[in-house]
Amino acid sequence: RWECYRLNKYSSFEKIKNRLESKIDRDEYQTLSVELGDLKALLNTESNTHFINLINQLILLIESIILNKKYSKTNESLGKLIEAIKITTPTFSLDNYKNFAYSSMELRILMDIALLDNKIKFTEKSLEIMEFCIKTVDPNEELYPKICYNLSYTYHRLDMDKNALKYSNLGIEYCTKHRNYNGLNLLYFRKGIAEYLLGYKTYMDSLEKCIHFCEILSQYKLRDMVITNCKKLYDIDIC
């Protein structure tokens, strides 16, 4: 009976986590307070230290996302992420991060740290952390294509288009292999832009697939943004 109770609670945690990731994939940040409230309610019924740590890390991740996306408080957002990793790795810092082994949750947070560092000052540190994440993550984990996408974008910002293409392709391969279509639209967008900048004729096929998967996933706002940005930034007419 106790094991069944614990499995049910972990299942509830996973459902909240999956809802969160789904909202992030769709750029739906306005209602993250729902997941935040559900996690805090779950926390009040928990006594297992490991599980409490997991919940608190996810709470801090959500708080970080809200600070960044809703209030544009990037430094405070970064502070929340560092605090989250320190729950399980108390001596963690951006200078010694390579010294530790990380859980999937911690790698997810570390990836967001790299993204925020990229946004705040765009140094080589953000690329270095993202490369560490891709080398560390299990290539069969759901986190893998997210890191591929973000690494592709980071390389794009550095005008390293062949690397941007490489990691968008790796992310697409994962999604195809595991039949996980969330994020395929974004990966095909990165692939298409990299191909365009490299002078490859296949870029339009990739961008059309991006639009196709936006529609399959009912992400019409993202579809329209892709079409607008392609025209505005690259003079590419998709539709």
Language-model-derived ranges and their functions:
Residues 41-54, 70, 85-103, 133-141, ...:
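Flexible helix-coil transition and linker loops at the boundaries of alpha-helical arrays
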Residues 55-58, 101, 108, 146, ...:
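Residue register of alpha-helical TPR repeats
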Residues 1-76, 80:
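Flexible inter-repeat linkers and adjacent short helices
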Residues 23, 67-68, 110, 117, ...:
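Residue at a conserved register position within TPR or TPR-like alpha-solenoid repeats
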Residues 165, 169-239:
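Long, low-complexity regulatory tails in eukaryotic proteins
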Residues 26, 70-71, 120, 151, ...:
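Structural motif corresponding to the intra-repeat A-B loop/turn of tetratricopeptide repeats
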Residues 24-44, 71-92, 118-131, 159-169, ...:
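Helix-turn-helix repeat elements of alpha-solenoid scaffolds
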